[in-house]
Amino acid sequence: MELKHSISDYTEAEFLQLVTTICNADTSSEEELVKLVTHFEEMTEHPSGSDLIYYPKEGDDDSPSGIVNTVKQWRAANGKSGFKQG
């Protein structure tokens, strides 16, 4: 999986693939998973970081698409760039 430099370099579908890979722990090693989680935290800039995945708030949609929607809504509400169109 190619890691991009900015969340705006990802389409929503590409970012969903990243989140799905993390949620399913579909990596060849623990080291690779940690790298993806760190990348998720850096790209989203969300104050909850990886807790969105591993320790979601009660009632939150903790599916990969729910996590992506949470990130998208938070970034929009905080004046941050969104996903690349396409």
Swiss-Prot record:
Q: Which GO terms describe its biological process?
A: bacteriocin immunity
Q: Which Gene3D superfamilies match?
A: Colicin E immunity protein (1.10.1200.20)
Cellular component terms (Gene Ontology): protein-containing complex
Q: Which InterPro entries match?
A: Colicin_E_sf (IPR035900), Colicin_pyocin (IPR000290)
Tell me the domain of life: Bacteria
Q: Where are the transmembrane segments?
A: none
Q: Which GO terms describe its molecular function?
A: protein domain specific binding; toxic substance binding
Q: Which UniProt keywords apply?
A: Bacteriocin immunity, Plasmid
Primary role = This protein is able to protect a cell, which harbors the plasmid ColE9 encoding colicin E9, against colicin E9, it binds specifically to the DNase-type colicin and inhibits its bactericidal activity.
Query: Which family does the similarity line name?
Result: Belongs to the colicins ColE2/ColE8/ColE9 and pyocins S1/S2 family.
What name appears for this protein in its UniProt entry? Answer: Colicin-E9 immunity protein
Write the lineage as a comma-separated list. Bacteria, Pseudomonadati, Pseudomonadota, Gammaproteobacteria, Enterobacterales
